[in-house]
Each structure stands twice: as C-alpha cells, then as structure tokens.
C-alpha cells in the first residue's frame, strides 16, 4: 500500500482516553460497543500515564477523558493532574452523574481545562426514561451551574433523536435559562447501541426540518438579544447526500485508547474486521505509524469505484469506514450516505420507513450490563456454530 509520507509523519493531535465502559446510565444511543460487558480489565493508573507520556511525546496536544462514565475512575484527579503537567489541553466528557462541587474544585486544581455535560432531554420525566435514573435531570442541572460557578465555560451536549427532537424549543430554552456558553445539539449517529436502536431513534424528515428551522430562529433571537450562547446543530448522516470525512481522516488526527488498552482510529472501529493492537503489546508510536489497521485507509490507494475516480475523494476520503461496513459488509465500499454509492437506496429507504413507523419508547434496547452480556452470549454462541 502506498501511504504518503506526509500522512505517516503526522502525529495524532487528539487523544481520546476511554477510561472505563462502566456507567450509571443506560442510554440507548451510546456509542460504546454492544459487548462492552465482556471487557473485564481496565488499564491501571500507571498504564494510563504511560499512554499519555507516549502520546505527548508524539505531538498530541488535546486529551479527552471519556467512557462510559470517567467519573467512576477513582484516579481521575490524578490522571488529570498528570496530563496537565505533560502540557495537554484536557477535556472531561461526562454525564454529570457522580460529579460534585468538591470534585469540580479538585479537577480545577489539577488543571482540567474543559467540562462537557450531557443531557437526555429538557424535562425530568423523559430524562428518566432515556437514562434510567430518576435523579439524573436535577443532578445535571445542578452540576451545569456548578461548572459555571467554578469559572469553566458551560458546555452542554444533547443527543437529538426521534423521542426528544420535538422538544427542541424546550431544550434550547433550558440551555438559555442555565446561561450555557456552548450547546451541541448532536443528532444521533448510528453506531454501537444507537445502531441497534436505529429504527426507533431515527427522526423523520419533517422532524429534521423542524429542528433546523427552530435552531436557526433561536440563533437569530440570541443575536438580537446579544446573548452569548452558541448553538451547534449536528445533522445526521442519514439525511446527507455526501459523506463526512471519517473522523477527520482515518489515522490522521484522532486516536482512541479503549479501557482495556486496545488502540483505535475511532471509537467504533472495533466493528471492522481488522486486528487492532493493544498498548500492552506495542508502543503508541509503532501502532500509529506501522499497524496495518491504522494504515488501511490512509491516502486514497485503498479506494474502490466510484470513490477512486471521484473528484471529491480527497475531500471526504470515501466517508465513514464503519458505516460502510455496517451497511455493505465491505469496509472498502463507498459510504452508503453518498448518493453515488450503489447502495445509497438503503439510506433513502431508512428515511422513508420513519414516515410509516410509529415506534414506542419502550421499544428501545437499553445500554446496560444485562443486555450487553446477553448480546455477548448470543455472539459467542453464533461463533461456536461457525
């Protein structure tokens, strides 16, 4: 494979540390793998520190602490402090469950730069159904205010889907009431548990149009009243005609280390039929530069038609490899989101099906250890029959 030297020599600028798959919530759109409960061993404090040292030596500058719920790691303050001392810009991506004012103060003292808190909905009732926690909504509100009190920008994330998209006005009103600085309205992308629940979660075309119009109206309101809140609406792939560049370019910017030490180009890459090395077996630098899995989709030599001759191939790099594999079972295929894909009709059909289906929220398969273990058992039983 001909990999351009310019791509080989670029360091991963963004390191995502998935500290744990453990989580107190059970969101049906979680991007964690379905069989996450099969992961029994997490990297130790010293192993994570070694990962951070290696990444920083390569040139990584931003470090995200994620999960699962990273607050469940008892060594989180220690890891934040160590990453700060190495010179990382650090970001905590959290549900807010388990967060306290004391912990926020500890994290601030340790050098944490940024905190993002996720919400499920704009009201306690729907939040409880989606998260599985009766107290989650009030806790998130309190911690969003506490983050602001400790002089962090308030950054909120709402995953938008069929069951909460019509709350878009109330979601934005809640964000304004909390005086949020940044609000990410991230329409559900279908990986992990979200893919399992796609038929229930995918919004209708009318819902998408409504949400886009309301966000634009609120942006105008915010400008007219000189408010500081910034609204970012992330459109779903399934309502695009051209694919997005896979994670900013496969093996170009982003690197993920899973709780067990598996090193990935993105969080969903485990779904691909590739062998991904672990940090216990090879150095991060060796994995980034030499592992076949990281070089598999660098450059454009790997592309099949219609990508190979497409004038946009350097712009979108063929789209998302995980999405291509999920829908075609060919990881080299054109992302079916692209209208030039020979199976783009699958995307169109998924949109149309939303207009003739009426899913109930009880249809959702929740992300919890019981369901994960059941999925793992079924997958193991299927493998034993091969």
From Swiss-Prot:
This is PqqA peptide cyclase. Its cofactor is [4Fe-4S] cluster. The lineage of its organism: Bacteria, Pseudomonadati, Pseudomonadota, Gammaproteobacteria, Moraxellales. It comes from Acinetobacter baylyi (strain ATCC 33305 / BD413 / ADP1). Pathway: Cofactor biosynthesis; pyrroloquinoline quinone biosynthesis. Catalyzes the cross-linking of a glutamate residue and a tyrosine residue in the PqqA protein as part of the biosynthesis of pyrroloquinoline quinone (PQQ). Its EC number is 1.21.98.4. Residues 9-228 form the Radical SAM core domain. The gene is pqqE. Interacts with PqqD. The interaction is necessary for activity of PqqE. SMART domains: Elp3. [4Fe-4S] cluster binds at residues 23, 27, 30. Keywords: 4Fe-4S, Iron, Iron-sulfur, Metal-binding, Oxidoreductase, PQQ biosynthesis, S-adenosyl-L-methionine. Binds 1 [4Fe-4S] cluster. The cluster is coordinated with 3 cysteines and an exchangeable S-adenosyl-L-methionine.
């Amino acid at each position: 494979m001909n990999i351009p030297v310019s791509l080989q020599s670029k360091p991963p600028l963004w390191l995502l540390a998935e500290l744990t798959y453990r989580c107190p919530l059970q969101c049906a759109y979680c991007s964690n793998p379905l069989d996450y409960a099969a992961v029994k061993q997490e990297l130790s404090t010293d192993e994570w520190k070694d990962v951070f040292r290696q990444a920083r030596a390569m040139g990584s500058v931003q470090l995200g602490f994620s999960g699962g719920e990273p607050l469940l790691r008892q060594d989180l303050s220690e890891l934040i402090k160590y990453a700060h001392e190495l010179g990382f810009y650090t970001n905590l991506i959290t549900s807010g469950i388990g967060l306290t004012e004391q912990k926020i103060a500890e994290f601030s003292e340790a050098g944490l730069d940024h905190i993002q808190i996720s919400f499920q909905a704009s009201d306690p009732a729907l939040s409880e159904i989606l998260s599985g926690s009766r107290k989650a909504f009030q806790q998130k509100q309190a911690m969003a205010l506490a983050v602001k009190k400790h002089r962090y920008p308030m950054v909120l994330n709402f995953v938008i889907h069929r069951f909460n998209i019509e709350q878009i006005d109330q979601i934005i009103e809640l964000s304004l009431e909390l005086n949020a600085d940044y609000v990410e309205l991230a329409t559900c992308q279908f990986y992990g548990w979200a893919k399992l629940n796609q038929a229930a979660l995918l919004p209708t075309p009318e819902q998408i149009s409504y949400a886009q119009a309301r966000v634009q109206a609120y942006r105008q309101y915010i400008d007219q009243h000189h408010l500081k809140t910034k609204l970012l609406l992330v459109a779903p792939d399934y309502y695009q005609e051209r694919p997005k560049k896979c994670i900013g370019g496969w093996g170009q910017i982003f690197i993920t280390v899973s709780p067990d030490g598996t090193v990935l180009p993105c969080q969903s890459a485990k779904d691909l039929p590739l062998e991904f090395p672990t940090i216990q077996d090879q150095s991060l630098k060796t994995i980034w530069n030499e592992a076949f899995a990281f070089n598999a989709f660098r450059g454009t030599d790997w592309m099949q038609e219609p990508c190979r001759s497409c004038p946009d191939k350097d712009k979108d790099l063929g789209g998302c490899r995980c999405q291509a594999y999920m829908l075609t079972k060919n990881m080299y295929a054109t992302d079916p989101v692209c209208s030039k894909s020979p199976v783009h009709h699958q995307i169109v059909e998924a949109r149309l099906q939303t207009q003739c289906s009426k899913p109930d929220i009880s249809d959702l398969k929740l992300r919890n250890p019981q369901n994960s273990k059941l999925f793992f058992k079924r997958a193991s039983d299927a493998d034993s029959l091969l």
